[in-house]
Curated annotation (Swiss-Prot):
PANTHER family for the chain: SIROHYDROCHLORIN FERROCHELATASE, CHLOROPLASTIC
Species for this entry: Methanosarcina mazei (strain ATCC BAA-159 / DSM 3647 / Goe1 / Go1 / JCM 11833 / OCM 88) (Methanosarcina frisia)
Active site: 12
Family from the record: Belongs to the CbiX family. CbiXS subfamily.
Protein's GO biological process: anaerobic cobalamin biosynthetic process; methanogenesis
Official protein name in the record: Sirohydrochlorin cobaltochelatase
Keyword Lyase applies: yes
Residues that bind Ni(2+): 12, 78
Assembly: Homotetramer; dimer of dimers.
Reactions it catalyzes: Co-sirohydrochlorin + 2 H(+) = sirohydrochlorin + Co(2+); Ni-sirohydrochlorin + 2 H(+) = sirohydrochlorin + Ni(2+)
């Protein structure tokens, strides 16, 4: 069986539309660069789709495994407690989703964290501000 990866990009959500736009655009960039991957964005609060709705968005896509990646810089309560509970993850950060009547394994990625790519982006923003 051929593997088909799904990516669930998880955003915090906000009453302001810009937060949703940023996370959705990041998901779109991933999808454009990796056309063989199914990418969906979902949000914790104040934005739609919710995580549950985003997971439903994998229906009919044929994904065989999903990576849930929080589009957050650092860990906090949402990362360590809320998202794992919503996704029914075990202590290793893995779980099973039912999509189209099939069990699909789910793995939970780390937040963005401290990374040279983030540092370069910060420096780019500094240069743009000058």
């Amino acid at each position: 069986m051929t593997e088909k990866l799904g990516i669930l990009a998880i955003g915090h959500g906000s009453k302001l539309p810009y937060n949703k736009e940023v996370v959705t655009q990041i998901a779109n960039y991933i999808a454009q660069k990796h056309s063989d991957v199914v990418v969906r964005a979902g949000f914790m609060e104040n934005s739609e789709p919710t995580l549950e709705e985003a997971i439903e968005g994998f229906s009919g896509t044929g994904v065989t495994k999903i990576s849930a990646v929080p589009v957050f810089l650092a860990s906090g309560v949402h990362i360590t407690k809320d998202i794992p509970e919503i996704l029914s993850l075990d202590k290793e950060g893995c779980g099973i989703l039912e999509i189209d009547g099939k069990e699909v394994p789910l793995c939970y990625a780390k937040p963005l964290g401290a990374d040279e790519l983030i540092a370069e982006l910060v420096f780019k923003r500094v240069q743009e501000s000058l």
